[in-house]
């Protein structure tokens, strides 16, 4: 950690604040779990855990999407607030999970390739791993500018026994998970 002193002139007085900033001395491996999380469920949390453990990730960021392009109607601000709070409550007991609101704007569409490009610009020394479920994987070619996503991160795709991803091997890393309680 690095401590930096900040001197501020406020009115006639001068205040000194100490700001603690985390200085990254090494590359971090960050997993990205995007989605509507409507609602977030145990499958999302288990997928985050599997990715964290199996690929030696440092953190998993959950990004609730406020206005996904594949949805017909826009969320209200109130509905988005509820989804954010559900995610916050679901991940709060796991110190490796954090909430990121980069895609939470309900007034415009957010696209994964733009979000990942943005993260790479802000954190150029970090490695990003975009985590997908099997259903999203098989619709991946329908995503806007999906090929650009491959240049910004490694794709971790969760597979179920009944799915075949052989056509996409070489572009993605498969994340084999145990059956979730939802699959039973």
Residue ranges and their predicted role:
Residues 153-167:
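Short, flexible loop segments at boundaries between secondary-structure elements
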């Amino acid at each position: 950690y690095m401590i930096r002193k900040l001197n501020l002139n406020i009115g006639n007085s001068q205040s000194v604040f100490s700001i603690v900033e985390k200085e990254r001395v090494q590359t971090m491996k960050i997993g990205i779990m995007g989605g509507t999380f409507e609602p977030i469920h145990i499958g999302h949390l288990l997928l985050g855990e599997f990715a964290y453990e199996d690929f030696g990730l440092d953190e998993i960021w959950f990004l609730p999407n406020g206005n996904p392009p594949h949805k017909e109607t826009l969320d209200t601000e109130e509905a988005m607030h509820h989804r954010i709070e559900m995610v916050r409550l679901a991940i709060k007991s796991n110190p490796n999970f954090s909430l990121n609101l980069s895609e939470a704007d309900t007034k415009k569409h957010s696209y994964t390739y733009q979000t990942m490009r943005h993260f790479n610009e802000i954190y150029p020394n970090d490695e990003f791993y975009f985590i997908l479920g099997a259903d999203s994987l098989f619709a991946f070619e329908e995503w806007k500018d999906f090929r650009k996503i491959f240049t910004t991160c490694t794709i971790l795709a969760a597979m179920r026994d009944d799915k075949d991803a052989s056509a996409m091997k070489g572009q993605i890393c498969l994340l084999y998970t145990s059956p979730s309680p939802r699959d039973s």
